[in-house]
């Protein structure tokens, strides 16, 4: 009971959520460039982009969620499936709204999988076992289903909760594709196929340590503000918000009731420890220059190196997302009896920089060149160009700033 009270009264500073959201914001600040090739005019594609999972999420929103949860868990699995239909033609399928859709599974729902090396040396997913949970209304038992995929068939079973979880076969259908329509999306590749490495695993441990120290602070504040009253059992008294500690009757009769109150000097040490852990989290996430809420002593070189590391981290994540999305679109086209010949291009450079620091440097260069003997216009032109690069949001705006269109009156 006491542990539950401490959990309920302790705030949680969710650094994992903050960092995952920051990564997501940088990765999808500019939308990926998607060339769908031969399937770009298919009506199924337009419907899929507007509602990827048949629950209203657009494809961009779906991929953002995929990136968020792969950042947390290390990997997720995206399944591209198509509902069963008795339609005989493609026109009938379109009329019924039958098309491929996407579904995301986090690691706790991926029960088993197997990769096998083909004759060409490529590893191929040959078996997959997934757990699906169907939430029911209040007062009704939740239903659990198991879906198993092989290259030849797809099996669906219901978990019998009355018989120690024994699966009850429900249906078995032929796998029309001849392969398993699933793609593992990694945050970072690990040594084992199908298991990724989380971006925030160490950060989560540090955040838990911070939460424990916040709990200690809360307890110290509570005990300091509400001291305990020490009395014998016969004394009839109350201690307000504080506790009452009863002494045995055998104690010295000369003892009078007194207050027991701990010192609060250790709170400052705990707060300093929390601050040090937050700085460590920023270093681990390469965000010391982005998440700091106070001025920290960092040289210009250290700041630039921090941004380079963050840019490299985001670039690696972008490559993994691009590779996964290309594989997903191949499965989508295969469900429609086509071959994906398009191209997916995620941004690989994120141009993370401290504009204030860069402007200070350019200002010093301009002032120095102005006082130098024999200063030429070329130096000033370079400074002006760099200032335009800082002010422009993208390459198109930079081009317009460097090549302004003059009006007829100005010509």
Feature-to-residue mapping (PLM):
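Residues in well-ordered beta-strands of folded domains
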Residues: 79, 129-131, 246, 345-347, ...
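Extended, regular secondary-structure scaffolds
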Residues: 67-190
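Short secondary-structure junctions and interdomain/linker hinges
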Residues: 26, 34, 55-63, 69-77, ...
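Extended, charged amphipathic alpha-helical segments
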Residues: 165-305
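Extended, helix-rich architectural segments
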Residues: 1-105, 409-411
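Short amphipathic alpha-helical segments
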Residues: 44, 54-58, 62, 70, ...
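Alpha-helix boundary/N-cap detector
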Residues: 3-18, 22, 36, 40-43, ...
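C-terminal helix-loop subdomains that flank or include functional centers
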Residues: 250, 269, 276-411
